[in-house]
Structure formats: C-alpha cells, structure tokens
UniProtKB/Swiss-Prot annotation:
EC number: 3.6.4.-
Protein name as annotated: Actin-3, muscle-specific
Lineage: Eukaryota, Metazoa, Ecdysozoa, Arthropoda, Hexapoda
Family under the similarity heading: Belongs to the actin family.
Tissue specificity comment: Muscle.
Enzyme class: hydrolase
GO cellular component terms attached to this protein's record: cytoplasm; cytoskeleton
Positions of the pro-segment in this chain: 1-2
Length: 376
C-alpha cells in the first residue's frame, strides 16, 4: 500500500517485545521492549527535564536508575495505565502517526478474557479515537503468515506459550492449551544456573544481560544425556561472553541446559508437560479426522522457538509420541520471531478483510461488546 494515508497499523503487543508497523509491509518498523520504567530516586539535578516515566528502549537504556515494569504478563495485559503509555509511545514516537487517521489491528493471546478485549476496544476508540479497529488471535496470524489455514501453532514468546489447533482458519478453543513457561522463565533459569557457576546476576538490569547471553549462545540438544556427556568430557561446547564491564565469562552445558527446560519443565520445578507433550495433548483433544492434518502442519512461532536445534528435537519427540504411520512435519520459518506481526500485516491488507473492521460508528452504537461479535 503506497498511500500511507489509509494504511492500517498493525500492533502486536507481546509480553516481552512490542512489534508495530504498517499493513502491507513485510516486517514491523518498530520493535521495542514492552517496558515502562519509573525513576527509583527523585532527581537531584534541577532542570534536567526528568520524565516521570520512560517506555521501551529509552527505559532499557536508563535501566540503572529505573524500576522496570512489564504491563503484559503471560500474554495478557494486566496494567492498563502502563499499556496506554506503550500504545501512545507506539503511535506517536515509534510510528509517528496520528491514530485517529488509521485503522488499527491489535493482537491478543488465545483465551484472552472477554473483559480484556472490551477494554482494548474501549481504549482504542475512546483514548486514541481510531476510525476502526480489530483484535486478532496471535497464533492464527502466525498460521496465516506461513501460508496455511489449517495446522497447529506452537507460539512461545517471552511470557507464555500456547498450542493452538486451527482448522480452516478457525481456532478450536476446546483444544487450546496454555503453558506458563516461556522466554522470561528461561532467562530466570539461566540466571540461576550461572549463579551456580559463580557469576552473580540479580537486578532487573542484569537480567537483560542474561537474556542477551541466552539469545546469543543457547541451543537445544537433540539428545540431552549425550550432550551432557560431551560437555563433561571436553571443552568443545564452551563459549565465552563479554559482559558490559569487560569481564569475560565462560558458559558450557548451561547453553543447552537452559532451553532443555522447554522439554523438561521439572528443571524449573514445574509439574507441567513439556512443549512436545503439550502439542501432542492439544492434537489429541481435536477430532480424530483432523489430527493427520495437524501432525503434518506443526508451525512454530515466537522468539522462544528461535533456538538452534529446536525443530529437529521437536520432530524427534513428536515422532516418539504419535502413531508410527503418521507423517509429521515441523514448520519453523526463519522469520518466526515476527510471524504474528507478519500475519497481521497480511490480514489487514486483504481486500476481503476490509468489511471485518469494527468502525467507530458501530462502537458508538453497540459499545465494547461489539468486539465479541465481530472478532472471533
């Protein structure tokens, strides 16, 4: 869409990162942490122009003097005042657009409480005066981005993981499973196991350093026991990482022990099934006739599925669980970190979608409840 005047805005608010941009683009223009920071101490320097809150990258860069809060927990918005700040920052500072001039497509977690959807709708129309808006389920958008309408999506981000079976474009709510195990838990676990090695990471600012170590060095082992043996026998798996203060730390079996907890949540002291079993359980909750189609279209999406080796391991684990004759295919597109946003960009630019928007007029006539009738 070349005329930016009417391009829809696509905003994917994740627990960890907010992705925003224009419908029709192939990648989000703005990607920033879903963080609101408030100063820990009163400013000493008068006239420094200190703000009472910072959002996104600015909050991140000033993290030493701020208390950081994430308004989205486990995929669901829990702090609306901070969320409004994030949306304001998205429109005015990141995309530099007037929200009253563009339709806005927002995303939501599967099984998002009804009241939450209504509140999102209300804020868009009443605070930002958008002409039209729509709320789409994240996993469904990821499936669209992979060019499918049927499949099961394993969407794992920073705050929550979901397995969502989708048939002919519709999510099957009775078979959606939620796993409160995602990137943030893995970062915390890596902090813990690095502490055992003698490196101490405790503050919110240091957690961000550990997150970076995780993203750069961690991977999923195909065979955990064998990998542990290799790590014990030689130093071939060790990598070094330079901290911001110049200190260099070495990390060995932590590289694969950390993401292994996706498959063995008992590492984190959790009793839930791993991601492979969750996918399997989700498929088993579906009608027997569509399972074959789901096994052949297992789509990975979200930042926590970015570990090298995760798709091969998933293939191996699901193959062990499923009937032996069945064809299993794991789809892990390289751009899966942003596939929810990309799916939103595709959806909002379809000509057939244009009648799906909730207009300001419809909202004024029916109130926030309209979102349940038009977005499903």
């Amino acid at each position: 869409m070349c005329d930016d005047e009417v391009a829809a805005l696509v905003v994917d608010n994740g627990s960890g990162m907010c992705k925003a941009g224009f419908a029709g683009d192939d990648a989000p223009r703005a990607v920033f942490p879903s963080i609101v920071g408030r100063p820990r101490h009163q400013g000493v320097m008068v006239g420094m122009g200190q703000k009472d809150s910072y959002v996104g990258d600015e909050a991140q860069s000033k993290r030493g003097i701020l208390t950081l809060k994430y308004p989205i927990e486990h995929g669901i918005i829990t702090n609306w005042d901070d969320m409004e700040k994030i949306w304001h920052h998205t429109f005015y500072n990141e995309l530099r657009v007037a929200p009253e001039e563009h339709p806005v497509l927002l995303t939501e977690a599967p099984l998002n409480p009804k009241a939450n959807r209504e509140k999102m709708t209300q804020i868009m129309f009443e605070t930002f005066n958008t002409p039209a808006m729509y709320v789409a389920i994240q996993a469904v958008l990821s499936l669209y981005a992979s060019g499918r309408t049927t499949g099961i999506v394993l969407d794992s981000g920073d705050g929550v993981s979901h397995t969502v079976p989708i048939y002919e474009g519709y999510a099957l709510p009775h078979a959606i499973l939620r796993l409160d195990l995602a990137g943030r838990d893995l970062t915390d676990y890596l902090m813990k196991i690095l502490t055992e090695r003698g490196y101490s990471f405790t503050t919110t600012a240091e957690r961000e350093i550990v997150r970076d170590i995780k993203e750069k060095l961690c991977y999923v082992a195909l065979d955990f026991e064998q990998e542990m043996a290799t790590a014990a026998a030689s130093t071939s798996l060790e990598k070094s990482y330079e901290l911001p203060d110049g200190q260099v730390i070495t990390i060995g079996n932590e590289r694969f022990r950390c993401p292994e907890s996706l498959f063995q949540p008992s590492f984190l002291g959790m009793e839930s099934s791993g991601i492979h079993e969750t996918v399997y359980n989700s498929i088993m909750k579906c009608d027997v006739d569509i399972r074959k189609d789901l096994y052949a279209n297992i789509v990975m999406s979200g930042g926590t599925t970015m570990y090298p080796g995760i798709a091969d391991r998933m293939q191996k684990e699901i193959t062990a669980l499923a009937p032996s004759t069945i064809k299993i295919k794991i789809i892990a597109p390289p751009e899966r970190k942003y596939s929810v946003w990309i799916g939103g960009s595709i959806l909002a630019s379809l000509s057939t979608f244009q009648q799906m928007w909730i207009s300001k007029q419809e909202y004024d006539e029916s109130g926030p409840g309209i979102v349940h009738r038009k977005c499903f």
